[in-house]
Amino acid sequence: MEDRVIAGMQSTVSRRDFIRTTAVVAAATAGGLAPGAAEGTDLLGAPGAAGRGTLIDTNVTLSRWPCRRLPLDETSALVARLRSQGVEQAWAGSFDGLLHKDIASVNARLAEECRKNGRGLLMPFGSVNPVLPNWEEELCRCHEEHKMPGIRLHPNYHGYKLDEPAFARLLDIARECGLIVQLVVTMEDERTQHPLMRAPHVNVMPLLALLASRSNIKIVLLNWSRGVSSALVEKLAAVGQIHFDIATLEGVGGVANLLKQVPADRVVLGSHAPFFYLESAVLNLK
């Protein structure tokens, strides 16, 4: 199976090569590996990963989804499932970051939970809400105190748009700190959202203008495929600073179709576990 060619791609890329590329891209984005470090090696996962088949999942979430219990919403159970699927490293946000106003406590709990579980598998990505007072201080705390490699943003739950000055300021600070910015376009299919928790897709169009004047900032779009048109995907891919996860891609040829629009070195594995089944994302690589 490792050498099976993903059908429909414009260039011949084996599953093994694609997994290597997405894993190395994730590691390089996190600053742990130079983009070309895997050339001539068998590295398939996180920096220092031994053996084949290891993966980096850039999209998992800890704690409780507000509307219902999810399978694997206990951190220890999620870690066990990640390991069983060959995941060597997982970038973790917190469901608490959606609605809690005490974001500092949310991030402190997230950092501690990642330290206590997984023996280094979990990398915390803190929540930052630029609508709240002192958000700049919390952003710096994620970087300086918690030593997080990045942050995860939920504009649709926090009530701001990407063309507002606060978001531009957030990008500038994140760039200065060398932080990855994960932008969640949607958390849940709009058809199944709780009536009192309607959250529209984030409009990511403003990224085109924002990134035109901001180089060296790392953006990862999560759960984006239902909220971003094909035409906009091509424009975003042309920017060169944006990476795309595969969590919400649908259909047998979802990954192959994406690779017709986006270079393989900017596509990363993301499962949206435990909200989605981890196995679904892994199967998308086959």
Locate the predicted segments by residue.
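C-terminal segment of N-terminal export signals and the immediately downstream linker at the start
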Residues: 33-68
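His/Asp/Glu-enriched, well-ordered alpha-helical/loop segment
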Residues: 268-286
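Active-site neighborhood of phospho(di)ester-bond hydrolases with catalytic His/Asp-centered motifs
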Residues: 56-58, 91-94, 125-126, 152, ...
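N-terminal secretory signal peptides
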Residues: 1-13
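Active-site environment of divalent metal-dependent phosphoester hydrolases
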Residues: 63-65, 97-100, 130-134, 158, ...
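Catalytic pocket-lining loop regions of alpha/beta-barrel enzymes
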Residues: 149-150, 163-268
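N-terminal export leaders
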Residues: 14-35
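Active-site gating/metal-coordination segments in enzymes
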Residues: 88-89, 97, 101-189
